[in-house]
């Protein structure tokens, strides 16, 4: 199908929800926008998915997330890993919780148990969780440092790292073979929970993660010397780090931790930042002001 055929298919097929169709009706007179949304499938590359949020085959939405997850599920099933399950985490971006749920429910419908964090968590904790739980794979819904209109989907393997060759290309091949949305499996959350295929994870993993972090300290005696007086300024950039970073610093005894108040809470719009990238010195303007 060409891009107009795809556009009409999404408008007319009963598989797609009314909200999606209404979004597409609003661009009926914008040929360039229709083409951009439908001229290709959102590429599933070595890093997973990443794209602008919206309706269309070339956008991040519940349907492209389901399609990618079905491909990953097919690969897991061929590897005999269904019994191990998949751990899923997500960040503070628009629709991250919804995309995480869609991935979990697709996995569950394929007979693969999904362990889903009860709220946003940083990516390293996802890596820790999937190893701790003995999962075969992990998914993080995040677009890292991209602008607010983006979201993404990263795949991790049982070693806790992002998938590498040859697995990455094998998973890509499975995703590309999912060409019919009607073949993508899903189920309700209530049914998945009742079947034991959807399980929330949270505090128990947090505790274990914090304890493991403490084991990585190279010079604990130095922390004891300076913890009472050292002043630390921290900013989570509206993302996932606020709770875990403050928690580990408190548990280590640091008494003077100052979090940038304007950037403390999760905010999918990244309101105080032009570009939410810690490699950009300008992103630390508020933190440096607080420090001074």
Regions found by a protein language model. Give the residues of each.
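Short, well-ordered alpha-helical packing segments
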Residues: 73, 104, 108, 127-131, ...
């Amino acid at each position: 199908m060409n891009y107009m055929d795809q556009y009409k298919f999404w408008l007319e097929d009963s598989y797609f929800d009314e909200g999606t169709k209404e979004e597409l009706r609003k661009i009926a007179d914008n040929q360039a926008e229709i083409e951009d949304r439908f001229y290709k499938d959102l590429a599933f590359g070595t890093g997973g998915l990443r794209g602008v949020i919206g309706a269309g085959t070339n956008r991040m939405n519940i349907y492209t997330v389901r399609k990618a997850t079905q491909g990953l599920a097919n690969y897991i099933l061929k590897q005999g890993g269904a019994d191990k399950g998949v751990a899923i985490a997500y960040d503070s971006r628009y629709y991250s919780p919804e995309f995480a749920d869609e991935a979990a429910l697709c996995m569950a419908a394929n007979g693969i148990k999904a362990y889903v964090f009860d709220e946003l968590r940083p990516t390293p904790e996802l890596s820790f969780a999937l190893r701790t739980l003995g999962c075969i794979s992990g998914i993080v819904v995040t677009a890292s440092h991209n602008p607010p209109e983006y979201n993404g989907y990263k795949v991790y393997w049982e070693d806790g790292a992002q998938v590498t060759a040859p697995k990455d290309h094998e998973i890509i091949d499975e995703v590309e073979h999912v060409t019919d949305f009607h073949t993508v499996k899903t189920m309700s959350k209530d049914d998945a929970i009742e079947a034991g295929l959807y399980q929330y994870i949270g505090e128990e993993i947090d505790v274990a993660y914090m304890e493991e972090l403490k084991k990585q300290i190279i010079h604990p005696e130095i922390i004891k010397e300076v913890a009472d007086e050292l002043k630390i300024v921290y900013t989570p950039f509206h993302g996932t780090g606020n709770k875990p970073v403050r928690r580990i610093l408190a548990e280590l005894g640091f008494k003077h931790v100052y979090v940038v108040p304007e950037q403390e809470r999760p905010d999918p719009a990244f309101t105080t930042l032009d570009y939410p990238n810690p490699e950009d010195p300008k992103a630390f303007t508020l933190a440096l002001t607080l420090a001074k």
